[in-house]
Amino acid sequence: MDWIIAWNPDWIIEIVSPGNPRHDYVLKLNLYNEAGVREYWIVDPAKESVWVYYFEESEFKAEAHSFKDEIKVNIYDDLYIDFSEFID
């Protein structure tokens, strides 16, 4: 599979692919890191979980959250996403 990204977005949010989660958790994570994406979130509605990956220079960081959390977007100073709004 060849991917071409015309520009490097700062932040990408993906909904996990139920049929092929490895694609989101491994392949896309590495692809986006190599492309210069600074923050990548993987949202899994079935597990009500959010994995936050962010890249700072040579460091790679990962955080696990649930839909009960208000999650800070690490690359922006004052931006939070409240996932509790999505729970039935």
Feature-to-residue mapping (PLM):
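C-terminal interaction segment
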Residues: 1-35, 42-88
